[in-house]
Amino acid sequence: MTNWIERAQDVLQQEADAIIRIKAFINEDFVKSIYLIKESQGRLVVTGIGKSAIIAQKLVATFNSTGTPAIFMHAADAIHGDLGIIQPEDVVLCLSKSGNTPEISVLVPFFKMRGNKLIALVGNTDSYLAKEADFVLDCSVEHEACPNNLAPTSSSTAQLALGDALASCLIEMRGFTSQDFARYHPGGILGKRLYVKVKDLYKFNERPEVAPDTPMDSVILEISGKR
């Protein structure tokens, strides 16, 4: 009988191992990539297809909330009109496990023709994408945590972690502070802690008011009724 606790722990271990493994792949291309993104006068366009597209969307959210303007472009939609999103000064970050999908093969020549710098966050450094990119971030994994070694599990975790490494380095490089973070999150706890005043938290007509000589039982009722 399968021990499902051990199986779940094994999945987590495999994904953790995948992240540890890609530490050794961090090189000068990573450093050049963060400088390229920071110094760009445009935005960071993050693209991918399949599970890579989902990871790309999460990374865009992280970049935007931490001071790096970014937009998501689905690779399949891009080759059917969404390429108009890309402006001359934009940097493209392309996520792909294989680096050889048909959509990527169509997109890359467009990026090169337009002069957009291309960063490949890719699981196959011998792929078309890796060979054509300006900078290559290797996030290859030995196997997926999926029991069939098919569904993106370890590979998507590695993509996410490496993307977070990019974002975190950019945070430090830009000197992005908790106050900056709060400005982008007025609805979050940190934003409220730094910027919301007591007067913002109640409606004027719901403010408890009593006279100096109001009996204590009435004071308690007034406060309790308008919390």
Language model features with spans:
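Glycine-rich phosphate-binding loops that contact phosphosugars or nucleotide phosphates
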Residues: 42-171
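Short, basic/glycine-rich phosphate-binding loops at helix/coil junctions
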Residues: 9-14, 59, 63, 192-203
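Bateman/CBS regulatory modules and CBS-like beta-alpha motifs in cytosolic regions of diverse proteins
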Residues: 192-225
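Short, compositionally biased "basic patch" segments
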Residues: 1-10, 49-57
